[in-house]
């Protein structure tokens, strides 16, 4: 079983607090799949406004957590770490469905599988679950570019 702790994750993802949304990798297999977790606590910044009377993790951040997990798998598969001259763009999402809320105290378990990698576009099947219950699912697409080649309109 191949695992990564938070210090190892930070070597592969440029994200930092408050947007680093992967706490641990439980297992990964190069070119195939990865399983990771996000421990959701009441101290998350977003709970101050989403929603004070009923805290729920925003869907867009659940998708971002899956996208970060997918990016980790891609970097691990390529055997490289990001550098100051590269950027990974999240370029597409299909079939996103939210099945249950993610709340303080939950552990979001993220499972991502590579569907294909063609012409620099990575496509993944991604799911997130809490206590064995499906919370969200989506197909994600990402690409990596060098800073000099990255068009401002290519992504966020």
UniProtKB/Swiss-Prot annotation:
Q: Which organism is it from?
A: Janthinobacterium sp. (strain Marseille) (Minibacterium massiliensis)
Q: Which family does it belong to?
A: Belongs to the thioester dehydratase family. FabZ subfamily.
Q: Which GO terms describe its cellular component?
A: cytoplasm; membrane
> Which UniProt keywords are given for this protein, alphabetically ordered?
Cytoplasm, Lipid A biosynthesis, Lipid biosynthesis, Lipid metabolism, Lyase
Q: Which gene encodes it?
A: fabZ
Lineage of the organism: Bacteria, Pseudomonadati, Pseudomonadota, Betaproteobacteria, Burkholderiales
Cross-referenced NCBIfam families, in alphabetical order?
Answer: fabZ, PRK00006.1
**Catalytic activity line of the entry:** a (3R)-hydroxyacyl-[ACP] = a (2E)-enoyl-[ACP] + H2O
Tell me the superkingdom of the source: Bacteria
Name the UniProt record assigns to this protein: 3-hydroxyacyl-[acyl-carrier-protein] dehydratase FabZ
Q: Where does this one sit in the cell?
A: Cytoplasm
